[in-house]
UniProtKB/Swiss-Prot annotation:
Catalyzes the attachment of proline to tRNA(Pro) in a two-step reaction: proline is first activated by ATP to form Pro-AMP and then transferred to the acceptor end of tRNA(Pro). This is Proline--tRNA ligase. GO terms for cellular component: aminoacyl-tRNA synthetase multienzyme complex; cytoplasm. Homodimer. Belongs to the class-II aminoacyl-tRNA synthetase family. ProS type 3 subfamily. Signal peptide: none annotated. NCBIfam families: proS_fam_I. SMART domains: ProRS-C_1 (SM00946). Its EC number is 6.1.1.15.
Length: 476
């Protein structure tokens, strides 16, 4: 193993923030762009996003969701149509005021999200109740001028999918928004090996212009939360602001009920901080850019090794995302590079292995080395992909379960937040009480967990009896 190469990564126990940026830069995941807050998604990270797209598209198409693409620029008059919405994004809006030397008559904004653009589109597509529901999604880039930036977590430009739907009834729309947050939770477990907490945002934390916001919250290795996906029930807020109406069964005019929902390239940051170690990122095998690295040993002096490696590549590439490293660099260097870049499975083949008609399979997550007969390699890789996924998920679940703590008073909350835990408390306060907690602990209300039913207790801030529980944590 090339220890010098691995030494470039700061130990996560020593400095988690520095470890995170080291993993990104040394793992060829991203490099900084020409503007503050912008990054270049290098092939090693963009491949993750491509695999997310491929797998998530299959899921939403089963729901009859259709993909489309809307323009990037939003006129000022349009974005001002929904007051709460524009106020929520005002500090982050990037404005276009000139084209060449000509000052525009109306300011244009780079989309921070696309609710208003979808609203205008829905207006042109809906005439009768027979046109409902209309279920749409776009894969796009969005722009938000963040004050504090961090690669993948907070960027001035990032990638996401945003689904937008219009429905006939309140019940149908509300249920669809709940269905999507559950789909996100399932997707994170099934493809990213990341367990999440499903919950509802408090009033102060919900999406600007939404009636209700549902969220999935993931726990990073340092105990901080990462909001990893949201689903919003918009009610008729945008429908009435933009006159998105249809002719009902009795020929009367009715307004639609709407939802919006999205995940973004933040999930790449989640993968790093949930699964990574001091050797670099560990990519979950089902969405890994490369699932298998084939590494040759002494191939420069043994042409038969190179030939067999190429044969294996041709055999495996139809079932897995495979790359081959047949360079003349040392085996230790090639192995370390594979580890830093997070490839789940490494296959090493040298002249001694050929004599025994086998290869050595190394798991990125456990460092376990397994001798595998060449004719059994494909089935073994399928098996190991499942085992690696289950191991990553199990470890992440264990951490999440260990670091969710229940307390019943404010002093205990402060102590547990300081330890880096998710703290679940009886809480019926509002923004005022939330701000006090944030000021004194730097923790925010992550969500009202949907899958937790607690006993009636006294709120830790107001002392009133409540059945509502809220999880507080520091977050990214």
């Amino acid at each position: 193993m090339n220890i010098k190469l691995l030494d470039k990564i700061t130990p996560l126990e020593q400095d988690f923030a520095k470890w995170y940026t080291d993993v990104i830069t040394k793992g060829n995941l991203a490099t900084y762009g020409v503007l503050k807050g912008n990054i270049v998604f290098m092939p090693n990270s963009y491949g993750i996003w491509e695999n997310v797209q491929s797998n998530f598209n299959k899921i939403i198409k089963e729901l009859n969701v259709k993909n489309l693409y809307l323009p990037t620029l939003i006129p000022e008059s349009l974005i001002n149509s929904e007051k709460d919405h524009v106020q929520g994004f005002a500090p982050e809006l990037i404005t276009v005021e000139k084209v060449g030397d000509k000052v525009l008559n109306e300011k244009l904004f780079l989309r921070p999200t696309s609710e208003v653009l979808f609203a205008e589109y829905f207006k042109t597509q809906l005439n009768s109740y027979n046109d409902l529901p209309l279920l749409l999604n776009q894969w796009a880039n969005v722009f938000r001028w963040e004050k504090t930036t961090s690669p993948f977590l907070r960027n001035s430009e990032f990638l996401w999918q945003e689904g937008h739907t219009s429905h006939y009834s309140e019940e149908e729309a509300h249920q669809f928004s709940k269905k999507m947050i559950q789909i996100y939770a399932n997707f994170f477990e099934e493809f990213l090996a990341i367990p999440v907490i499903i919950g509802q945002k408090t009033e102060s934390e919900k999406f600007a212009g939404a009636h209700t916001t549902y969220t999935i919250e993931a726990m990073m290795k340092d105990g901080r939360a990462l909001q990893s996906g949201t689903s919003h029930y918009l009610g008729q807020n945008f429908a009435k602001a933009f006159d998105i109406s249809f002719k009902d069964k009795d020929n009367s005019k009715s307004f639609v009920y709407q939802t919006s929902w999205g995940i973004s390239t933040r999930l790449i940051g989640a993968i790093i901080m949930v699964h990574g170690d001091n050797r670099g990122i560990i990519m979950p095998p089902k969405i890994a850019t490369n699932q298998v690295d084939i590494i040759t040993v002494f191939a420069n002096k043994n042409p038969e090794v190179l030939q067999k490696a190429n044969d294996l590549f041709k055999t495996l590439k139809n079932d897995f995302r495979v790359r081959i490293n047949d360079s003349n660099k040392s085996v230790g260097f090639k192995a370390a590079q594979s580890e830093i870049e997070g490839t789940p499975i490494r296959i090493e083949i040298g002249p001694e292995d050929l004599k025994q008609n086998k290869v050595i399979l190394i798991r990125r997550d456990t460092q376990e080395k397994i001798d595998v007969k060449i004719d059994e390699l494909k089935s073994e890789i399928f098996s190991q992909i499942e085992k690696i996924h289950e191991n990553l998920l199990m470890q992440a679940k264990r951490l999440l379960n260990e670091k969710i703590v229940d307390v019943e008073d404010y002093e205990s909350l402060k102590k547990e937040i300081a330890k880096g835990n998710f703290v679940r408390v009886p809480f019926d306060g509002d923004k005022k009480e939330e701000e006090i907690i944030k000021k004194e602990t730097f923790a925010t209300p992550r969500c009202i967990p949907l899958n937790f039913i607690g006993e009636t207790k006294k709120c830790i801030m107001t002392n009133k009896e409540t059945k509502r529980y809220v999880i507080f944590a520091k977050s990214y």
